[in-house]
């Protein structure tokens, strides 16, 4: 039986590697994107207590959520792929840890979302849909949240749970 070794990354042909530079050209560009993403936190918290004010407000909140996803996904994937390239490189493990910390901050900032959506009665929700017809694009998301009504914690309890995210990820991030 022949024993084969896994080649070192530098010995793998370029066409067989991830095109990580398609996400960010350099680690510094990734750091800049992560720093810029932190500006989302005050934008999210500005919606606290306001989701039911108008259809337009709720629509702007969901659009911000979309914007965050589009900006944050490449940041997450870059850090994870860099870490996967060579798990011995502490700098890339730290990048994953930074992403995890930021995700926890963002989840904590948005912890009000579910309790506020659940607090909207059906009549008000119908009014919000009428005020902003584009909210229909988010109906499935809203319905999924509202269906879990019996299993959702209060605003403060959701924030505590979100803050525990970094601790829960710790076993995966030890390096």
What is each residue range found by the language model?
Residues 1-175:
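A well-structured
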């Amino acid at each position: 039986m022949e024993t084969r070794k896994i080649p070192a990354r530098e010995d793998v042909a370029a066409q067989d590697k991830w095109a990580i530079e398609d996400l960010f050209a350099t680690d510094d560009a990734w750091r800049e994107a992560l720093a810029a993403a932190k500006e989302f936190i005050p934008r999210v918290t500005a919606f606290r207590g306001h989701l039911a004010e108008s259809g337009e407000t709720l629509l702007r909140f969901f659009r911000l959520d979309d914007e965050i996803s589009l900006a944050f996904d490449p940041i997450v994937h870059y850090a994870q792929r860099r870490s996967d390239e060579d798990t011995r490189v502490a700098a890339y493990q730290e990048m994953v840890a930074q992403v995890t910390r930021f995700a926890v901050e963002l989840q904590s900032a948005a912890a009000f979302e579910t309790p506020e959506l659940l607090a909207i009665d059906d009549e008000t929700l119908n009014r919000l849909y009428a005020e902003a017809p584009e909210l229909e694009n988010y109906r499935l998301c809203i319905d999924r949240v509202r269906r879990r009504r019996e299993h959702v914690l209060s605003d403060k309890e959701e924030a505590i749970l979100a803050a525990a995210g970094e601790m829960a990820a710790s076993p995966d991030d030890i390096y």
